[in-house]
Structure formats: structure tokens, C-alpha cells
Amino acid sequence: MRHTVDAMETAAEARDVGDLMEFIAADFRDGYGQGRDELRRYVQGYFIANQSIHLLTRIEQIDFPHPDEARLQVTVGMVGREADAANAWNLAADVHDFDVTLRRDGEDWRVIHAARRRPGG
């Protein structure tokens, strides 16, 4: 499971939409009911707005309610430099907690659901 999270982190830091979306299931839904296409557009916009992205991820909890399903609570520290601040010291930093559900797809794991949690909640 850590390998999958690390690979997603690497793809995001490389700002590679295609590589990141490889980890997202076709039937993905977020906490607002939006699907894979909406997530792709959001990620593309985020990558355009932030010329550099650095993530720190910590898996707080992993549960396996079924052999082919994993539920994770993940904390992600995000630091980015906005495209228009390329020569400035301005950084945008946030910490978010996520509930993420993954489903086994052959030898791989794909995200089928993700929702942002309130910090500490």
C-alpha cells in the first residue's frame, strides 16, 4: 500500500497528470460525487497554477474490510510555488486529511473514492 501512495506522490510532484490518473479507477467518486473526469480537470488546473509541488504524505491508518479493498486515512502536507511567483519566495502550504478507498485491480491498487476530512476529524 505504501508503494502505491509513494508512486502517486511521485507522479504529483512530477506534475504528470497521466501517471497520476493511472492510479484512479474509472468509477472513481469523490466526497462531492464528482468523477474521474472532474478530478483530472482539477489536477490539471492545480498543476498549471503551481509550477513546483512538494508533498509529504503520512498514512495514519489502513484497514482491509475485504481482501481486495483498502481504506486509508492519509495526511498530506502540500507545498507549492504558484506559476506567477516563479522568482518570489512566496510559497503556498496546506495540510489536508483524506479518507481514501482503494480497490485491487490485478496486481495494482486504484483509488475508487477520496474525500477530504476536517483536520483531526
Show the residue positions of the predicted features:
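Short, low-complexity N-terminal intrinsically disordered segments enriched in polar/charged residues
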Residues: 1-23
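Glycine-centered loop/turn positions within well-structured domains
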Residues: 18, 26, 107
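Short, flexible helix-adjacent loops and helix caps
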Residues: 13, 25-28, 84
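Short solvent-exposed beta->alpha transition segments
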Residues: 21-71, 75-78
